[in-house]
A protein has these predicted regions:
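Mature, structured domains of secreted/extracytosolic soluble proteins
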Residues: 24-189
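Bacterial Sec-dependent N-terminal signal peptides
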Residues: 1-27
Length: 189
């Protein structure tokens, strides 16, 4: 290998290292929120972040089974109310296993899209809507039905069509295509 080739390779290697260092520096500058033991990066989309959360394995599997991965990787924006694995564990035994079967894809999709609001709504915006609504705010989901948001003390809650309430346990997990609010109960249309 001649000297010119070595210099070119060395130059390319230096540029690559400089670029990857710049990317790493950019990632560390982002304001992240820890969810399920993993940092959630605002520069990543909902799916890219969710797959790293140890607390959302069931949700990720359900999203895959429903064929919603591509949708939630799209530009959105979306507000996702993300139930934890513990929330799914509260469902009657065998419910999750039944829902992820191919023949139940339509029902699973309905349940999952009931956890998604169009647009990017911060907890502050939802809180303001609740205040403006004299203690509650109805919001239409992507599925088509409404959820009722309400507050108690410093906590934000959401009630489903069946009257079950979920507490927002981690709010404002910003994503490149929306925001996630972690909840402790699965909502049912």
């Amino acid at each position: 290998m001649n000297t010119k080739s070595k210099i070119t390779i060395l130059g390319i290697s230096f540029l690559f290292l400089a670029f990857s260092g710049e990317v790493n520096a950019q990632m560390t500058k982002e304001k992240t929120v820890m969810v399920g033991g993993a940092a959630m990066y605002p520069s990543k989309n909902i799916i890219e972040n969710a797959v790293n959360s140890k607390d959302h394995k069931t949700l990720v599997a359900a999203v895959k089974a429903a064929g919603l991965v591509e949708t939630l990787q799209g530009s959105g924006p979306f507000t996702v109310l993300a139930p934890t694995d513990a929330a799914f564990a509260k469902l009657p035994k065998g419910t999750v296993e039944t829902l992820v079967k191919p023949e139940n894809k339509e029902m699973l999709t309905q349940i999952l899209t009931y956890h998604v609001l169009p647009g990017k709504l911060s907890a502050k915006e939802i809180w303001a809507a609740v205040k403006a609504g004299n203690g509650k705010s109805m919001m239409k989901t992507v599925e088509g039905e409404e959820l009722t948001f309400w507050t108690k003390g410093k906590d934000l809650y959401v009630k489903d069509a069946k009257g079950n309430s979920a507490k927002v346990t981690i709010a404002d997990v910003n994503q490149s295509n929306g925001v996630i609010h972690v909840i402790d109960t699965v909502l049912m249309p």
